[in-house]
């Protein structure tokens, strides 16, 4: 069995977790108390969901997940919410005091008090697995717990489970909608610390998701619940291949093999289609080629950047629902003829396809229409460097004046860590730039230097 353990850190992580587990339960027919009505199990023979749930002797299905936050309010909502019986009480771990949007508190002072409890709980979950495949880590870049504690935990996981994959789902601070002034600091510190510990990181930009909710779902003022449900669908699409049997199955390590050309270039851009409200879906024919084309529209991306300015290094299309390979091949052939989509010259093929016959599930009372097919595209493009450039610029503006730095130093950090992290991100931007240069151009430049 190839089990995955989900770790939800901080408020953003926990709220994404709520949306994801709600959706998983609906998809697998598991009730909020963890029971699975027996009509599903008889002769179904499909037990792939065991990658995400473990079954107790009493027939209860418990998520292989841990929720951690340094302050209790958000996780208390889970303890009293609809799904309170689903989780083992020890899987919901809370501290007493907040990380206060401060990376240093999450990583050094307060985080280190709780990290051993968390690792102990993860160890118990891991011992329960026959063949642990890896970890999915949900967090935000901007918060203190999401940035500081996540990076601490990732370092420790690398020590304890060296060879296991670690995939991140990270909320990137939105250009317009910021929840904290110090988000650029936290983001850059956490990216620097986790860069070598994470195998693949799917970034989600709140603003991009706001816009999708406004534009495609006609929600005037999207709430976090709207955002998280949409993120839930995306995470579900990415993990569907681990939880259902499909025609072309994709597992965690397979993503990395196909999406990550160099260890540091591991930030794929996620696009999901169709995001459509029930009123509209009624009147639209969403064919395979239409939803495939929609994936190449910048408007459907989860991070604001323009792939038309960058080059694709790899591209993974994960279809679910009523999809046959013939349609997919036709759709991809059409895409390849378009000139706006450029691949780097050292990666000519570039499309990997996964097909899963389980159609997407709509959450009752949710915003997304029930559709018969959907696609999630993971693409590694050099354009995502724009996102880093934006963040670095904001960091520079504040750091030039050393604004807010004393809060971090007061918690035991040194200013040198800021400079080191910033240099690492400058190197990351440079890496992206170099990857996008055509090999022919690069050779020309080198020759030019000799004379």
UniProtKB/Swiss-Prot annotation:
* Example of a GO biological process term: microtubule-based process
Q: Which residues carry this modification: N6-acetyllysine?
A: 40
Q: Which domain of life is it from?
A: Eukaryota
User: Mainly localized where?
Assistant: cytoplasm
Q: Which SUPFAM superfamilies match?
A: Tubulin C-terminal domain-like, Tubulin nucleotide-binding domain-like
Keywords annotated in UniProt: Acetylation, Cytoplasm, Cytoskeleton, GTP-binding, Hydrolase, Magnesium, Metal-binding, Microtubule, Nucleotide-binding
The record's subcellular locations are: Cytoplasm, Cytoskeleton
| EC number, as in UniProt | 3.6.5.-
Question: How is the protein altered post-translationally, as described in the entry?
Answer: Undergoes a tyrosination/detyrosination cycle, the cyclic removal and re-addition of a C-terminal tyrosine residue by the enzymes tubulin tyrosine carboxypeptidase (TTCP) and tubulin tyrosine ligase (TTL), respectively. Acetylation of alpha chains at Lys-40 stabilizes microtubules and affects affinity and processivity of microtubule motors. This modification has a role in multiple cellular functions, ranging from cell motility, cell cycle progression or cell differentiation to intracellular trafficking and signaling.
Cofactor needs: Mg(2+)
The reaction(s) catalysed by this protein are: GTP + H2O = GDP + phosphate + H(+)
Q: Which family does it belong to?
A: Belongs to the tubulin family.
The function of this protein is:
Tubulin is the major constituent of microtubules, a cylinder consisting of laterally associated linear protofilaments composed of alpha- and beta-tubulin heterodimers. Microtubules grow by the addition of GTP-tubulin dimers to the microtubule end, where a stabilizing cap forms. Below the cap, tubulin dimers are in GDP-bound state, owing to GTPase activity of alpha-tubulin.
Q: What is this protein called?
A: Tubulin alpha-3 chain
Q: Which organism is it from?
A: Homarus americanus
